[in-house]
Amino acid sequence: MTARKGGAILLGAATTVAAVLAVSALLPPAEAQQRKSLRWTTAQVGSYGYTVAASMAKVLEQALGGEYTVTVQPYQSPTVAMKAVMTGEGEIAYTADIGMGEFAERTGPFKDFKPTTPELVHTWYAYPMETMIAVAAKDADKYKCWKDFSGKPVYFSQAGFQNWLNAQRIFKTLGYDFKHVQIDNKANADALERGTVVGSVIYTTAGRSLPAYWKESEVRLDFKVVDLCPDEVAKLKAAGYGIAEVEAKNAFTKDVGGTKFEAVPILFGYNVRADLPEDLVYKMIKAFYDKRDELMKIDPGFTPMAKDFIGMQVQGINSTPQIAVHPGLAKFLKEHKAWNDKWKIAGGS
């Protein structure tokens, strides 16, 4: 690990540098020197955000005509990745509606945070994730509702992850005691089997894709998903939460205790600093729009985006309308007759 300014910790730095050098070595000397850099910060290796970023980086490099080298940089969590971009360590940040909301309000991990570069603005929203909790099958009879996890040791995903933040706010809304135990993702199955944690947050993308560490856990461990109870769902809806239905057959390869589960969704995206050029960001968004069906074939998590690309951008902006929209996205939405004059356009580019 390499310590970074502002407390950020960059994982796999040597791998990232090696990847850049390898790409540069394939280019003619003049071209390698002329290519500009776009640093794409994500969550740590093994997370869904990191895994799919590599595929999107290839699409983006092609769309930009070889003018840029896109480097995927893994960080401890999306929160750290966001801060890294706003302290000059990247241009594109992996984030979600909940993280953008906390940043806008300067709450949670963003309390007292002071960016040293122009701030993140709405740019591109890519897929929803659905937060649930799973337990080892041998312990399933002990847990019927989420209230049964109150005050119990649970791995709520990596601290600072958007699903971790989502679980934290859910517990707060329901009045439950949030007792997080931090473990390595690779230890997820063992921790559940041994009882180090009694539950672990499990999440799907678009009700389909599991993160890499949960795919591994699915092979190694028999587990059950603990559904929200009706009174919990009612309380969350009354507080303004959306509830998504996840069909087990679309997300899991084995019996996990039911055919459908109710989950609390969050919307993930890749937002950039306000000072990135309008033309660059417009080309980026248009490339993902044009390649949306191709992205869906690469990973089913992109299915909702492919079906309603424009609507997903509108949803992302409306989640935190106090945050400005990048001029590149504003141009794209105006072309598609989807711009809302109540939104504000960032003036930093």
Q: Where are the regions that the model predicts?
A:
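Sec/Tat signal peptide C-region and signal peptidase I cleavage site
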Residues: 23-32
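Pocket-lining segment of extracytoplasmic ligand-binding domains
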Residues: 97-99, 106-115, 135-139, 177-277
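Bilobed "Venus flytrap"/periplasmic-binding protein-like clamshell domains
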Residues: 37-63, 68-71, 130-196, 204-205, ...
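An extracytoplasmic/periplasmic, membrane-proximal ligand-sensing/linker region
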Residues: 204-227, 235-238, 279-349
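Extracytoplasmic small-molecule ligand-binding "clamshell" domains
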Residues: 51-87, 256-258, 348
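N-terminal segment of the mature folded domain
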Residues: 86-125
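Bacterial N-terminal signal peptides that target proteins for export
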Residues: 1-16
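Ligand-binding clefts/hinges and TM-proximal coupling segments of bilobed small-molecule sensing domains
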Residues: 144, 150-169, 240-310
